[in-house]
UniProtKB/Swiss-Prot annotation:
Name under which the protein is recorded: Glutamate--tRNA ligase
Originating gene: gltX
GO molecular function, one term: ATP binding
Top enzyme class: ligase
Motif stretch ('HIGH' region): 10-20
Keyword terms: Aminoacyl-tRNA synthetase, ATP-binding, Cytoplasm, Ligase, Nucleotide-binding, Protein biosynthesis
Keyword Cytoplasm: yes
Keyword NADP applies: no
Reaction(s) this enzyme catalyzes, per UniProt: tRNA(Glu) + L-glutamate + ATP = L-glutamyl-tRNA(Glu) + AMP + diphosphate
Extent of motif 'KMSKS' region: 251-255
A GO CC annotation given for this chain: cytosol
Enzyme Commission designation: 6.1.1.17
Length: 504
């Protein structure tokens, strides 16, 4: 048997997600258990959304958890480069190879033509999908349009009938009718590959033997398997893990619970406990013990024992497990060092002291001034907002609109944060001083604090959003109907002036 090679391939387009860590953990344990290699590849073909800051946050977060990869963008390896943006010269030739073999074709349809196609399909009660119009062009027509410099994409051909059988390591045989699979774009008009082409090409060139990923990719598996067949390559073994769920069984979403690893790090969760908890997502030790280390998990790991029932990511259970680790796994000296590294690290002090120094008479003043920077949720109630000028309901609405704008931000620094809040206040016809007061309370527990955008920059996007969300709930939150009404108002507000800096 050849060497087992697995990978995690995150896109650096946002905060490092606990779901990424969960998939990475299972990939690493499977590879290590078989004496194989675990790779990290950055899938940053979406250059409008990908950022170096997000990539670094992903690497730092996974390392904080204790996950190490054998090959990757920061450690190198024999199959690099490990960023897709640095492999752009590779993908085009493979797309053209498929065209030459008759497995893919040029499509010159404009966005307007495709929109019209979808409208006509919907009018007939059909599911909108590409109708294969590019396949009707003759070779001469294609060449003529290429010579004329018309923009095009390259799409893969899909069987018109029959069933694709997917042999899944966990789920057995999965059947998907080819009629449900679209003629996927492989190469976009700007020459950039889509996820599907780049993913298959890279997995082959990096000799990945097992693709262990979330179940949301099951519907893409027919396209991927067909691409392997078209290229004449051996497909890797597929294994689709169940998605993490909220306690109400809904898909894990930052709208309901914090999903960023950085949030849990900022809250003071231990990396050992976090990794332990993720290891229990659909899997358990043979002896059913609650607590185990990464080394112990690797030793006993069996991918076939993963349960397909949606694993529940319950913050209360994570907190309980974290408390066990704190009480049972550390000496006083070790715990003192952890607390020092977490709360009194030099980086945090250097960010906080410029704001605290002018307000300090003695060193003991620092704790009450800056303690909120290393706290969890602020102990706010409706009374905490009573002294602010705006009515409580209007404060709550501003917090909700601010949260939506901040969730869409791609950069997190004080000037950008202030610009977002100022623009929102102007759109709502409010003075910035009045509008921003509830944000002060949400972030610091009081309006008597450091400049709020500086505080938000220090505690970071995950904790800032979580505290604002907590404050909204402390003010009573919103019912479903009110939430829908606010979404409509927010959309209109955004149209009034400068659009939020969103991830388009």
């Amino acid at each position: 048997m050849s060497e087992i090679r697995t990978r995690i391939a995150p896109s650096p387009t946002g905060d490092p997600h606990v779901g990424t860590a969960y998939i990475a953990l299972f990939n690493l344990c499977f590879a290590r258990q078989h004496g194989g290699k675990f790779l990290l590849r950055i899938e940053d073909t979406d250059q409008t959304r990908s950022t170096p800051e997000s990539e670094q946050a992903i690497l730092d977060s996974l390392r904080w958890l204790g996950l190490e990869w054998d090959e990757g963008p920061d450690v190198g390896g024999p199959h690099g480069p490990y960023r897709q943006s640095e492999r752009m010269d590779i993908y085009g030739k493979y797309a053209l190879e498929l065209v030459e073999k008759g497995h893919a074709f040029y499509c010159f349809a404009t966005a307007e033509e495709l929109d019209e196609m979808r409208r006509e399909q919907q009018a007939r009660g059909e599911t909108p999908r590409y109708d294969g119009r590019g396949l009707t062009l003759t070779s001469a027509e294609v060449q003529s349009r290429l010579d004329a410099g018309e923009p095009y994409v390259i799409r893969m051909k899909i069987p018109e009938e029959g069933v694709c059988e997917i042999d899944d390591m966990l789920r057995g045989k999965i059947e998907i009718e080819w009629s449900q699979v679209d003629m996927q774009v492989l190469l976009k008009a700007d020459g950039m590959p889509t996820y599907h082409l780049a993913n298959v090409v890279d997995d082959h060139l990096m000799q990945i033997t097992h693709v262990i990923r979330g179940e949301e990719w099951i519907n893409s598996a027919p396209k991927h398997l067909k691409l392997y067949e078209y290229f004449g390559w051996r497909a890797p073994v597929l294994c689709h893990l169940p998605l993490l769920r909220n306690p109400d069984k809904s898909k894990l979403s930052k709208r309901k619970n914090p999903t960023s690893i950085l949030y849990y790090k900022r809250m003071g969760y231990l990396p050992e406990a976090m990794l332990n908890y993720l290891g229990r997502m659909g899997w358990s030790m043979p002896d059913e013990r609650e607590k185990f280390t990464l080394v112990e998990m690797q030793e006993h790991f069996d991918l076939l024992r993963v349960s397909l029932g949606g694993p529940i990511f319950d913050v209360e259970k994570l907190s309980w497990l974290n408390s066990l680790w704190i009480r049972e796994n550390f000496t006083i000296e070790q715990l003192a060092q952890r607390l020092h590294d977490w709360a009194l690290n030099k980086d945090m002090l250097l960010q906080a002291l410029p704001h605290a120094q002018s307000r300090m008479t003695t060193l003991s003043d620092f704790a009450p001034l800056a303690g909120f920077l290393v706290s969890g949720m602020m102990p706010v109630t409706e009374a905490s907002f009573a002294s602010n000028k705006l009515p409580v309901e209007q404060q709550k609405e501003f917090l909700q609109f601010a949260l939506w704008r901040l969730e869409a931000l791609r950069t997190w620094e004080r000037d950008t944060l202030f610009a977002e809040l100022k623009t929102l206040a102007e759109q709502m016809g409010l003075k910035i001083k009045d509008a921003i007061a509830p944000v002060f309370v949400a972030i610091a527990g009081s309006t008597a604090s450091f400049p709020v955008v500086d505080s938000m920059q220090i505690i970071g996007p995950d904790m800032s959003r979580a505290r604002i969300r907590h404050a909204i709930n402390a003010l009573g939150g919103f019912g479903k109907n009110k939430q829908k009404d606010l979404e409509k108002v927010f959309a209109k507000l955004s149209e009034q002036g400068e659009e939020p800096a969103v991830n388009h």
